[in-house]
Amino acid sequence: MNTKISEHTPAMQQYLTIKEDFPDLLLFYRMGDFYELFFDDAKKAGALLNITVTARGKIRGKPIPMAGVPAHALENYLAKLVKQGMSAVICEQVGEVGKGLVERAVTRIITPGTLTDENLLDEARDSILLSLFCFQNNYFFAYADITRGDFQLTMGLNEQELQSEIERLRPAEILMPETANVPAFITALKPHRQPDWYFDSDSSYRLICEYYQTTTIDGFGIAPDDPALSAAGCLLQYLHDTHKYHLPPLKPLQKQHDHQYLLLDATTRRNLELEYTLNGESKHSLIATINRCSTAAGVRTLKRWINQPLIQHEYILERQEAVTALLTHADLDEIAKTLRATADIERITTRIALQTAKPRELAQLRDTLMQLPAINALLQTSAAHSPLLAAATQALMHCPQLGDLLMKALVEAPPLTLKEGGIFAAGYLPELDALHELTDHSAQLLEKMEQEEKAQTGLNTLKIGFNRVHGYYIDIPRSQAANAPAHWIRRQTLKNSERYVTESLKTLEERLLNAQDEALALEKQAYTELLITLDKQRDDLYRLATALAESDVLTCFARLAKEHHYCRPQFSNQIEIQITAGRHPVVEQLSAQPFIANDLVLHQKRQLLILTGPNMGGKSTYMRQTALIVILALAGSYVPAKEARIGRINRIFTRIGASDDLAGGRSTFMVEMTETANILNNADEHSLVIMDEIGRGTSTFDGLSLAWAVADHLLQKNRALTLFATHYFELTALVERHQHGANIHLSAAEDQEHIVFLYHIEEGATSKSYGLHVAKLAGVPQAVIHNANAKLRQLEEKRVPQRAHQALLPIESQKPSLSPQIKNILQQIQEINPDELSPKAAHEWLYQLKTLVRDLDKNEL
């Protein structure tokens, strides 16, 4: 669009002037009953929303592209845009519609990370706005969920740690400096570039102090030169840009510390399918499978707890004690039923602060507040045995006066929007009641005035009427005009009657005609005042919302434990994981067959387990269930096992499955080695490592050598608790030579034609993978199976056990053999006594030695 604004029509000039302030956002421009988009915005909207792109007028002979959506359907279209990561500006008609150009102004800015509208948010997900800043090769970021008031900073992260946090948070929107270079995985998320000055450290510090109305941030426990403050400053500036009238309420700024939570990198999160399965769906993920929550806020809290398990045992035990107390003393079904009737207080509280809460949401808040005594009663007995539940019940008692206020203020079923009116209950506002009396009983009031005038004048034939020209009037026959009182004012003379008005009739007319507008204005003012009153209790409401959500998750854990016979895990200060009859929490619920439970023992004297067994025998399931049991335990849940004992585990690593990275230009094997390198460089004795079939992406000897070296490194250097699944039977020799390793295998039974997977862990190794049996089960043609069997027998006959055994000995035990020539040279050197050699003899000996070396075969050097 290379035209001057002055070349356009007045309406289009107005559009372009507003658009200049929002070049990267889609501008929805209100024109009558539609919101219109023009030029490139129209083309983008047409593609994104699947709407028709037409034209409206021309400029320099070329049509101006235009697309539009009906005003009543705007929210549906905005929801579609937000799901695609797009942002939009809503420009409304704010002036009177009449002659000339209608005044318009931007009333809303919609971006994925700053949403608070109920119909645009996913109720089951946190809505994260993240601001990213790079300083001295480390990444610092601030993130906020304005729907719940959270505002956090992170420590400096490397690229892998950043990717892990992005995977955990899954931000709705990312902000970053205009000129910054970032990893490819950030670029793929389409971050919104912001001016570099938004990240200026001094400006950011001032902006944070202004927001919290302080002169320093020392009270937050954050250093004034912390680079993450630059990210926080940008985030606040962005909120200023998108919320011009009311800034979202944010709780005091907090800094997140690694030592509080179990570290899970992005690969591990994906491999363990915590929130999404490997195909990208939430169904059949761990969270979806264990979710028994009754509220949306509970689901969001459950996701946070599973995605960020605790590692400090005292806090985990608080949750455990609450689950135990609920299991022992509470009616879990009744608690769940009562919680289902509660509203999303967390998000309603934010909308109250922003003055965007709808009347119906206040009614939901009222009804929830009225439910609190019942919820409290259901939790009371359990709370006596749990400090966490006791604190929750205290929080539930903070807002009784708000419930009483809303009961008095609101009608039983308020309208959806404020402009519909009829929000407040009778008796709450006497002035409003009087206006409603006017609008609801106008006919009776006119009838009453008519009777009063008849009584005062004796004119029994007078009537009060109305027309659009003259409004309300008193009508009497012309024959009685002489008897009209002096204070009557003649309005109109007709053939058979005279029409008059009185001051009282004009006053009543004005009141009747204006009553509805006055009532709406009064309701709007009273509604704003009600929101301000409610917002004064914001902190109490947030605490109440947290108490309800956490009680919901704890009840979810208790119901899950009761339904599926989970046990309460024990914790120790040792480095260990010991599980008796452990089960996979997802597979056991999805399988129609009884799940085969298995034991696991890992500790400092049994650090690494080489796991062998048949394809499809359950190796991956066994390893994943171990990691999931640890995560559930650290989240505060009971676990699917008969017994479990978890030591000091601070981090989980996984290397499972095979996939390439086409976008990043990495082969399957390169991905495998990158993930392996991450584990070898970062795992320590407090880590749980899951390794599945290392080395299968290359040649047999390369793969076997790598697998051996990796396992050896994990045993001797990392000393992490490790499950190492492999089809290289030769690896079983490694742990036979190392006192801190052991072999285990998954058993199977076979005859000549069939195999039965027993899915049971046994001590020791197995040399068979039963790959041909699995191929047969998969439907591979019989001729191929026959040829494969023949080739297998041929290869097994050619196997040289001694050579394979020698190849896999530890490097230090493999002594190279020397040729006779080298042995001869070494022997001659050993026989020389340097002290007895004359200079001439020494010189001759050097020449002789040089001749001997020259005669050696080059391959023997």
Swiss-Prot record:
Keywords of this entry: ATP-binding, DNA damage, DNA repair, DNA-binding, Nucleotide-binding
One GO CC term, this protein: cytosol
Gene Ontology molecular function, alphabetical: ATP binding; ATP-dependent DNA damage sensor activity; damaged DNA binding; mismatched DNA binding
UniProt GO BP: mismatch repair
Binding residues for ATP: 613-620
Keyword Nucleotide-binding on entry: yes
Keyword Acetylation annotated: no
Function of the molecule: This protein is involved in the repair of mismatches in DNA. It is possible that it carries out the mismatch recognition step. This protein has a weak ATPase activity.
Family: Belongs to the DNA mismatch repair MutS family.
Protein name as it appears in the record: DNA mismatch repair protein MutS
Organism: Dichelobacter nodosus (strain VCS1703A)
